[in-house]
Amino acid sequence: MKFTSVLAFFLATLTASATPLYKRQNVTSGGGTVPVIITGGPAVSGSQSNVTTTTLFNSTSTLNITQLYQIATQVNQTLQSESSSGIIIVTNWRSIETLSFFCSIVFNTSKTIVITENFLWGVPILSSSDAEGRGTLVAGRDKVVYSGVFPPYTVPVGVLSGQKNVQWFFDACEPTLIASNSTIRTQYSNFTSAQISSNASSGTNTSSSSSSPLVPIIYEEGYSQSLIQSLSSSIQGLVVVSSGTSHNSTVASWTSVDFPVVYASDGSSGHDGSGIGFISNTSIPQGAISAGYLSPIQAQTLLSIAIHNQVTSSSELQQIFPVSQQ
Ligand SMILES: *[C@@H]1O[C@H](CO)[C@@H](O)[C@H](O)[C@H]1NC(C)=O
Ligand SMILES: *[C@@H]1O[C@H](CO)[C@@H](O)[C@H](O)[C@H]1NC(C)=O
Ligand SMILES: *[C@@H]1O[C@H](CO)[C@@H](O)[C@H](O)[C@H]1NC(C)=O
Ligand SMILES: *[C@@H]1O[C@H](CO)[C@@H](O)[C@H](O)[C@H]1NC(C)=O
Ligand SMILES: *[C@@H]1O[C@H](CO)[C@@H](O)[C@H](O)[C@H]1NC(C)=O
Ligand SMILES: *[C@@H]1O[C@H](CO)[C@@H](O)[C@H](O)[C@H]1NC(C)=O
Ligand SMILES: *[C@@H]1O[C@H](CO)[C@@H](O)[C@H](O)[C@H]1NC(C)=O
Ligand SMILES: *[C@@H]1O[C@H](CO)[C@@H](O)[C@H](O)[C@H]1NC(C)=O
Ligand SMILES: *[C@@H]1O[C@H](CO)[C@@H](O)[C@H](O)[C@H]1NC(C)=O
Ligand SMILES: *[C@@H]1O[C@H](CO)[C@@H](O)[C@H](O)[C@H]1NC(C)=O
Ligand SMILES: *[C@@H]1O[C@H](CO)[C@@H](O)[C@H](O)[C@H]1NC(C)=O
Ligand SMILES: *[C@@H]1O[C@H](CO)[C@@H](O)[C@H](O)[C@H]1NC(C)=O
């Protein structure tokens, strides 16, 4: 099972950002350093020259949307002030999927953003020539480099071939979802803002009056009508993990709820366990939106970014998810 709990909440309180977000530590000085942002994951001992680390948090659980935007703000500042070809973000294993997808959507940059559990695995990527223009990448323990647009460890794009080198499998190119002519880039240019909105952006007043949307993930088999009713006043969106081929939804229609509902496939029905599935817009209840090939966590991340930018109508959301893009 991919999820440790049935409900994975993005919690709602936006903590005051007036407190210092990070502490900076000089690992080395001089030119040619690789910027590293630490948000969790195991501490790496041993000296590594040419690395400048900034510690934001030391989280052991899945990063929430507030933390993701805090990271984005820091990444944006760092990328603008450094001459490096990119940046490494170290995080815990639970957060790899949401962080790599979040960065793929939010950053429209030719610099490379490497998400990893251990910065040592990421350094060769940024040292390699030809690292730019590849978007967000995930560096795995196995020395393989994966695309950040797909669930981690599913779509390899290169392999480490030395201390400073990567053998890339493809020329640098843009994934369709976020290509420069994609719907997300052309019509939702506000998604590529790393700024934490300073005022409440949720359309409805919630008890916490926060700008961080709550978008839980539930399993199609695992919920009851009363659970949804008890949640409905406190959530801004919902991701339902489709039970797969045997479609036996307990809900025939979602047209009566006032938050967006996205159905996603967890890809576990695939023989090869690739972790990528597809759910078409014809096999979901009325009023719901299909996530296409996005995983449940990716759907949650994209929906949270959309809601953060006040994009909540079905017609708009349908264009964003990769199901009707032809
Ligand atoms: C996000 O997680 C941090 C650390 O666990 C927590 O302090 C904060 O309150 C959370 N924020 C939200 C919006 O849930
Ligand atoms: C980090 O290095 C820079 C340049 O070498 C230096 O100016 C700065 O004082 C150092 N900062 C710390 C905290 O050591
Ligand atoms: C890394 O640091 C070493 C010395 O610690 C230096 O010789 C080398 O040129 C540096 N490499 C880069 C790419 O800056
Ligand atoms: C994060 O905290 C854990 C303990 O909770 C500790 O073992 C680890 O070294 C810390 N990581 C960093 C980078 O400080
Ligand atoms: C984007 O451009 C490519 C060619 O560069 C084209 O094949 C594709 O159809 C375009 N997509 C959209 C949505 O316009
Ligand atoms: C993305 O970056 C390209 C090149 O820098 C730029 O032309 C385009 O307008 C940017 N798109 C968005 C949505 O910011
Ligand atoms: C990065 O920060 C600059 C200002 O410091 C801002 O103009 C720019 O829009 C930010 N970029 C993103 C992606 O938020
Ligand atoms: C929220 O921010 C926007 C600009 O980002 C501004 O136009 C709007 O007036 C603000 N709303 C409130 C209630 O402050
Ligand atoms: C939303 O909250 C504001 C102040 O927090 C209040 O003035 C307004 O009446 C509320 N709107 C609704 C629809 O509850
Ligand atoms: C739906 O559920 C009913 C009874 O629970 C069962 O008889 C039927 O075969 C199911 N349909 C599918 C497609 O699984
Ligand atoms: C972001 O862009 C979309 C599409 O243009 C628009 O509908 C939405 O209102 C924008 N969000 C904000 C907060 O301006
Ligand atoms: C499903 O998406 C296709 C485009 O791929 C569109 O033509 C069709 O109307 C959509 N169907 C529904 C039920 O939304």
From Swiss-Prot:
Please report what switches on or represses expression of this protein. Induced at very late stage of sporulation.
Q: Which GO terms describe its biological process?
A: ascospore wall assembly
Per UniProt, the keywords (alphabetical) are: Glycoprotein, Signal, Sporulation
Q: What domain of life does the native source organism fall in?
A: Eukaryota
Annotated ranges, domain Asparaginase/glutaminase: 19-324
**Glycosylated residues (UniProt):** 26, 50, 58, 64, 76, 108, 181, 190, 199, 205, 248, 281
Return the InterPro entries for the record. Answer: Asp/glu_Ase-like_sf (IPR036152), Asparaginase/glutaminase-like (IPR006034)
The signal sequence is 1-18
Q: What does this protein do?
A: Serves a protective function during the early stages of spore wall formation, and contributes to spore wall maturation.
Q: Which family does it belong to?
A: To yeast YGP1.
Q: What else is known?
A: The program of events of meiosis and spore formation reflects the sequential expression of at least four temporally distinct classes of sporulation-specific genes, SPS100 and SPS101 genes define a distinct class of very late sporulation genes.
What protein does this entry describe?
A: Sporulation-specific wall maturation protein
Q: Which organism is it from?
A: Saccharomyces cerevisiae (strain ATCC 204508 / S288c) (Baker's yeast)
